């Protein structure tokens, strides 16, 4: 199967895959950098709490302002451009949208976005892996009930791990363990958003140019990332949501105590 050939075919037939993107921050901008170079894909709209921030990220990855000049989703559909706004519900419910890419990095919001997309019959690519760590199987069940596809982003670590496991089993190798390792030293727990860039070998100016969020990157470093809490890994005691339960109902699968997680 050639994904590129299939996308070329859709482009030639004038029926591109129409995408709705929720969240145009650091991770969203990585995808935005690809879209102008990918045939057969039309980014119909972007929903972000900061439309101006989304436009700044689009400019950073090389988008021309004319590409996002649409005054509405209907206008974007008519002219093949992209609309930027704050109303994610309007974006998810638009009849022309084929797939929703959830890219907020906020696990609770991501669950709500996924459920709303399923209810509208939309496929979902969930880049917010923290949401999947908390209640991925339940989200997958809801997608199955709705008759749509729920997937993580291929290229991100969880999806690549699954791909490697599938490859190994197909080759006849027994897989006894699978996971993603990350270097962690005890003094990393002392990192704060004000000091984090030194651990990554970056200056604050370099991080700012790249649109990097110090709170988010600090959560990767100091052990307070939501994924660690979801899997009951040992993390620093200050993290209030350590061992937060994942409840039976996906709508209730939220942190029961306020935790520290950079968005």
Task: Indicate where each model-derived feature is located.
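N-terminal glycine-/serine-/threonine-rich beta1-alpha1-beta2 phosphate-ribose binding loop
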Residues: 1-116
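A short hydrophobic/small-residue beta-strand
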Residues: 123-125
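Hydrophobic, low-acid, alpha-helix-prone terminal segments
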Residues: 231-234, 243-247, 251-258, 262
């Amino acid at each position: 199967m050639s994904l590129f050939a299939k996308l070329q075919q859709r482009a030639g037939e004038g029926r591109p895959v129409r995408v709705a993107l929720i969240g145009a921050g650091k991770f969203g901008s990585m995808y935005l950098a690809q879209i102008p170079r990918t045939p057969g894909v039309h980014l119909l709209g972007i929903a972000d709490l900061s439309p101006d921030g989304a436009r700044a990220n689009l400019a950073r990855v090389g988008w021309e302002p004319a590409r996002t000049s649409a005054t509405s989703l209907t206008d974007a559909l008519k002219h093949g451009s992209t609309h930027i706004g704050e109303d994610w519900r309007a974006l998810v419910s638009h009849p022309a949208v084929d797939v929703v890419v959830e890219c907020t990095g906020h696990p609770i919001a991501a669950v709500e976005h996924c459920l709303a997309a399923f209810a509208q019959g939309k496929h979902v690519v969930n880049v917010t892996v923290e949401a999947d760590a908390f209640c991925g199987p339940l989200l997958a069940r809801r997608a199955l009930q709705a008759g749509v596809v729920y997937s993580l982003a291929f290229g991100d670590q969880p999806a690549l791990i699954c791909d490697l496991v599938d490859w190994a089993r197909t080759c006849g190798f027994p897989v006894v363990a699978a996971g993603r390792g990350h270097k962690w030293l005890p003094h990393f727990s002392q990192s704060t958003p004000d000091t984090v860039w030194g651990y990554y070998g970056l200056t604050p100016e370099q991080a700012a140019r790249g649109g990097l969020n110090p709170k988010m990157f600090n959560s990767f470093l100091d052990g307070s990332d939501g994924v660690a809490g979801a899997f009951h890994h040992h993390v620093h005691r200050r993290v209030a949501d350590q061992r937060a339960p994942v409840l039976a109902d996906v709508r209730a699968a939220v942190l029961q105590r306020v935790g520290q997680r950079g968005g």
